[in-house]
From Swiss-Prot:
InterPro entries: CobW/HypB/UreG_nucleotide-bd, P-loop_NTPase, UreG. Its main location: cytoplasm. The keyword Membrane does not apply. Belongs to the SIMIBI class G3E GTPase family. UreG subfamily. Gene3D superfamilies: P-loop containing nucleotide triphosphate hydrolases (3.40.50.300). This is Urease accessory protein UreG. GO terms for biological process: urea catabolic process. Keywords: Chaperone, Cytoplasm, GTP-binding, Nickel insertion, Nucleotide-binding. GO terms for molecular function: GTP binding; GTPase activity; nickel cation binding. GTP binds at G12, P13, V14, G15, A16, G17, K18, T19.
Protein backbone atom coordinates (compact mmCIF):
# COMPACT_ATOMS: atom_id res chain seq x y z
CA UNK A 1 0.00 0.00 0.00
CA UNK A 2 1.59 3.24 -1.11
CA UNK A 3 -0.17 5.32 1.55
CA UNK A 4 0.98 3.20 4.48
CA UNK A 5 -0.69 0.35 6.31
CA UNK A 6 -4.41 -0.10 6.85
CA UNK A 7 -5.14 1.08 10.40
CA UNK A 8 -7.96 -0.73 12.18
CA UNK A 9 -9.27 0.47 15.54
CA UNK A 10 -10.73 -2.15 17.89
CA UNK A 11 -12.88 -0.73 20.70
CA UNK A 12 -15.39 -1.91 23.27
CA UNK A 13 -15.99 -2.15 27.02
CA UNK A 14 -13.54 -3.84 29.40
CA UNK A 15 -13.77 -7.62 29.12
CA UNK A 16 -15.77 -7.69 25.88
CA UNK A 17 -13.04 -9.56 24.00
CA UNK A 18 -10.89 -6.91 22.27
CA UNK A 19 -7.59 -8.68 23.00
CA UNK A 20 -9.07 -12.04 22.00
CA UNK A 21 -10.21 -10.54 18.68
CA UNK A 22 -6.80 -8.93 18.12
CA UNK A 23 -5.11 -12.28 18.80
CA UNK A 24 -7.45 -14.16 16.46
CA UNK A 25 -6.99 -11.65 13.61
CA UNK A 26 -3.21 -11.89 14.04
CA UNK A 27 -3.39 -15.68 14.07
CA UNK A 28 -5.31 -15.61 10.77
CA UNK A 29 -3.45 -12.84 8.93
CA UNK A 30 0.12 -12.61 10.29
CA UNK A 31 1.27 -15.57 8.17
CA UNK A 32 -0.17 -13.89 5.07
CA UNK A 33 0.82 -10.22 5.32
CA UNK A 34 3.02 -7.83 7.30
CA UNK A 35 1.15 -6.65 10.38
CA UNK A 36 1.63 -5.12 13.82
CA UNK A 37 -0.46 -4.35 16.90
CA UNK A 38 -0.69 -1.37 19.26
CA UNK A 39 -2.50 -1.88 22.56
CA UNK A 40 -3.72 0.95 24.80
CA UNK A 41 -3.75 0.27 28.54
CA UNK A 42 -4.37 2.80 31.28
CA UNK A 43 -1.32 2.14 33.49
CA UNK A 44 0.16 -1.20 32.39
CA UNK A 45 1.08 -3.07 29.23
CA UNK A 46 -0.98 -6.07 30.19
CA UNK A 47 -2.74 -6.53 26.84
CA UNK A 48 0.53 -6.25 24.91
CA UNK A 49 2.09 -8.84 27.22
CA UNK A 50 -0.90 -11.17 26.74
CA UNK A 51 -0.43 -10.98 22.97
CA UNK A 52 3.30 -11.68 23.31
CA UNK A 53 2.53 -14.75 25.43
CA UNK A 54 0.09 -15.96 22.77
CA UNK A 55 3.01 -15.82 20.29
CA UNK A 56 0.82 -14.72 17.40
CA UNK A 57 3.34 -12.05 16.38
CA UNK A 58 7.03 -11.44 17.13
CA UNK A 59 7.28 -9.14 20.16
CA UNK A 60 8.90 -6.34 18.13
CA UNK A 61 5.65 -6.09 16.14
CA UNK A 62 3.62 -5.40 19.31
CA UNK A 63 3.65 -1.97 20.99
CA UNK A 64 1.93 -1.26 24.30
CA UNK A 65 1.15 2.38 25.04
CA UNK A 66 0.13 3.59 28.49
CA UNK A 67 -2.63 6.15 28.18
CA UNK A 68 -3.02 7.35 31.76
CA UNK A 69 -6.44 8.02 33.24
CA UNK A 70 -8.59 8.62 30.14
CA UNK A 71 -8.01 5.90 27.55
CA UNK A 72 -10.57 7.36 25.13
CA UNK A 73 -8.49 10.56 24.79
CA UNK A 74 -5.59 8.58 23.27
CA UNK A 75 -7.80 7.26 20.46
CA UNK A 76 -9.84 10.39 19.85
CA UNK A 77 -9.03 13.94 21.07
CA UNK A 78 -5.25 13.47 21.26
CA UNK A 79 -4.16 10.45 19.27
CA UNK A 80 -0.48 11.53 19.18
CA UNK A 81 0.75 8.67 21.39
CA UNK A 82 -0.79 6.14 18.98
CA UNK A 83 0.28 8.02 15.84
CA UNK A 84 3.86 8.03 17.19
CA UNK A 85 3.68 4.26 17.75
CA UNK A 86 2.43 3.77 14.17
CA UNK A 87 5.31 5.91 12.86
CA UNK A 88 7.81 3.79 14.83
CA UNK A 89 6.34 0.57 13.45
CA UNK A 90 6.36 1.98 9.89
CA UNK A 91 10.03 2.86 10.25
CA UNK A 92 10.88 -0.60 11.61
CA UNK A 93 8.76 -2.49 9.07
CA UNK A 94 8.49 -0.51 5.81
CA UNK A 95 6.42 -3.30 4.22
CA UNK A 96 3.68 -3.01 6.86
CA UNK A 97 0.20 -3.83 5.46
CA UNK A 98 -1.97 -3.73 8.61
CA UNK A 99 -1.86 -2.18 12.09
CA UNK A 100 -4.47 -3.13 14.69
CA UNK A 101 -5.01 -0.47 17.37
CA UNK A 102 -6.72 -1.90 20.43
CA UNK A 103 -8.26 0.77 22.65
CA UNK A 104 -8.13 0.76 26.41
CA UNK A 105 -11.33 -0.45 28.07
CA UNK A 106 -13.89 2.19 27.27
CA UNK A 107 -17.57 2.85 27.44
CA UNK A 108 -20.20 2.91 24.72
CA UNK A 109 -19.44 6.55 23.91
CA UNK A 110 -15.78 6.15 22.91
CA UNK A 111 -14.88 6.35 19.22
CA UNK A 112 -11.66 6.46 17.19
CA UNK A 113 -10.42 9.63 15.52
CA UNK A 114 -10.59 9.32 11.70
CA UNK A 115 -6.98 10.55 11.76
CA UNK A 116 -6.01 7.37 13.62
CA UNK A 117 -8.18 4.55 12.20
CA UNK A 118 -9.27 3.81 8.63
CA UNK A 119 -11.76 1.17 9.82
CA UNK A 120 -13.25 0.57 13.26
CA UNK A 121 -14.52 -2.59 14.92
CA UNK A 122 -16.57 -2.43 18.11
CA UNK A 123 -16.87 -5.48 20.38
CA UNK A 124 -19.70 -6.01 22.87
CA UNK A 125 -20.27 -8.89 25.26
CA UNK A 126 -23.43 -11.02 25.30
CA UNK A 127 -22.94 -11.56 29.04
CA UNK A 128 -23.33 -7.79 29.62
CA UNK A 129 -27.06 -8.23 29.11
CA UNK A 130 -29.96 -8.17 26.70
CA UNK A 131 -30.24 -4.39 26.56
CA UNK A 132 -26.67 -3.48 25.49
CA UNK A 133 -27.52 -2.86 21.79
CA UNK A 134 -30.42 -0.61 22.79
CA UNK A 135 -28.01 1.75 24.55
CA UNK A 136 -26.84 2.86 21.12
CA UNK A 137 -23.51 4.55 21.90
CA UNK A 138 -21.60 5.88 18.87
CA UNK A 139 -19.04 3.05 18.97
CA UNK A 140 -21.84 0.52 18.81
CA UNK A 141 -23.98 2.35 16.27
CA UNK A 142 -21.38 3.86 13.94
CA UNK A 143 -18.34 1.56 13.92
CA UNK A 144 -17.68 -0.07 10.55
CA UNK A 145 -18.23 -3.54 12.05
CA UNK A 146 -19.97 -4.60 15.27
CA UNK A 147 -18.89 -7.90 16.84
CA UNK A 148 -21.32 -9.36 19.39
CA UNK A 149 -18.99 -11.68 21.31
CA UNK A 150 -19.57 -14.59 23.72
CA UNK A 151 -22.83 -15.63 22.07
CA UNK A 152 -22.16 -19.14 23.41
CA UNK A 153 -22.88 -17.76 26.91
CA UNK A 154 -26.39 -16.51 26.02
CA UNK A 155 -28.29 -19.50 27.50
CA UNK A 156 -26.27 -19.25 30.73
CA UNK A 157 -26.89 -15.54 31.33
CA UNK A 158 -30.58 -15.40 30.43
CA UNK A 159 -30.07 -13.65 27.09
CA UNK A 160 -32.17 -14.44 24.01
CA UNK A 161 -29.49 -14.62 21.30
CA UNK A 162 -31.94 -14.10 18.42
CA UNK A 163 -33.40 -10.98 20.05
CA UNK A 164 -29.88 -9.72 20.85
CA UNK A 165 -28.93 -10.08 17.19
CA UNK A 166 -32.15 -8.37 16.03
CA UNK A 167 -31.54 -5.44 18.42
CA UNK A 168 -27.89 -5.19 17.37
CA UNK A 169 -28.84 -5.05 13.70
CA UNK A 170 -31.61 -2.51 14.41
CA UNK A 171 -29.08 -0.19 16.07
CA UNK A 172 -26.72 -0.32 13.09
CA UNK A 173 -28.68 1.22 10.18
CA UNK A 174 -27.55 -1.52 7.82
CA UNK A 175 -23.91 -1.63 8.91
CA UNK A 176 -22.55 -5.17 9.36
CA UNK A 177 -22.84 -7.26 12.53
CA UNK A 178 -20.98 -10.50 13.34
CA UNK A 179 -22.35 -12.81 16.03
CA UNK A 180 -19.25 -14.43 17.53
CA UNK A 181 -17.71 -16.65 20.17
CA UNK A 182 -14.14 -15.51 19.60
CA UNK A 183 -12.43 -17.83 22.08
CA UNK A 184 -13.84 -20.75 20.11
CA UNK A 185 -13.03 -19.19 16.74
CA UNK A 186 -16.68 -18.51 15.81
CA UNK A 187 -17.02 -15.31 13.78
CA UNK A 188 -13.29 -14.84 13.19
CA UNK A 189 -13.45 -15.73 9.47
CA UNK A 190 -16.21 -13.15 8.92
CA UNK A 191 -14.14 -10.43 10.63
CA UNK A 192 -11.05 -11.32 8.59
CA UNK A 193 -13.07 -11.33 5.35
CA UNK A 194 -14.49 -7.91 6.27
CA UNK A 195 -10.97 -6.49 6.78
CA UNK A 196 -9.74 -7.93 3.48
CA UNK A 197 -12.74 -6.66 1.50
CA UNK A 198 -13.30 -3.27 3.15
CA UNK A 199 -9.63 -2.54 3.78
CA UNK A 200 -8.36 -3.54 0.35
CA UNK A 201 -5.87 -5.97 1.87
CA UNK A 202 -4.18 -8.46 -0.44
CA UNK A 203 -2.97 -11.31 1.75
CA UNK A 204 -0.49 -13.74 0.22
CA UNK A 205 -0.88 -17.48 0.54
CA UNK A 206 0.39 -18.46 3.99
CA UNK A 207 4.03 -17.63 4.68
CA UNK A 208 5.94 -16.30 7.63
CA UNK A 209 6.47 -12.59 8.30
CA UNK A 210 8.56 -13.27 11.37
CA UNK A 211 10.99 -10.38 10.99
Amino acid sequence: MSNGPLRVGIGGPVGAGKTTLTEQIARALAPRLSMAVITNDIYTREDAEALMRAQVLPSERIRGVETGGCPHTAIREDASINLAAIAELNAAFPDLDLVLIESGGDNLAATFSPELADLTIYVIDTAAGQDIPRKRGPGLARSDLLVVNKTDLAPHVGVDAALLEADARASRAGRPVVMAALRHGKGVAEVVDFLIEQGGLQPCPAHSHGQ
